[in-house]
Amino acid sequence: MSALKDIVELTAKELVDNKDKVRVTEIEGEKTVVIELRVDPAELGKVIGKQGRIARALRTILTAIGRKIGKRVVLEILE
């Protein structure tokens, strides 16, 4: 399991009540890493946050790590 996937999974599980429904998938390409986060639709707002602040913060952290490893990181939050 990669550090990117670990960070997203740990953060999401701390934000939601139904931790069993948190699924994180990592798709790695040559220059890009896509992290897909799936949570219970009823708790989607907890992961996104008010006006998308939590999602934006997560993306900022992933972007910083991505620069260090030389890849573009994309976070997709799915139902």
Swiss-Prot record:
Q: Which GO terms describe its cellular component?
A: cytoplasm
Tell me the protein's name: RNA-binding protein KhpA
Chain's gene name? khpA
- Matching InterPro entries, A to Z? KH_dom-like_a/b (IPR015946), KH_sf_prok-type (IPR009019), KhpA (IPR020627)
User: Which Gene3D superfamilies does the record match to this protein?
Assistant: 3.30.300.20
The molecular function terms of the Gene Ontology recorded here are: RNA binding
Provide the function of this protein: A probable RNA-binding protein.
Show the stretches that span the lipid bilayer: none
User: SUPFAM superfamilies, alphabetically?
Assistant: Prokaryotic type KH domain (KH-domain type II)
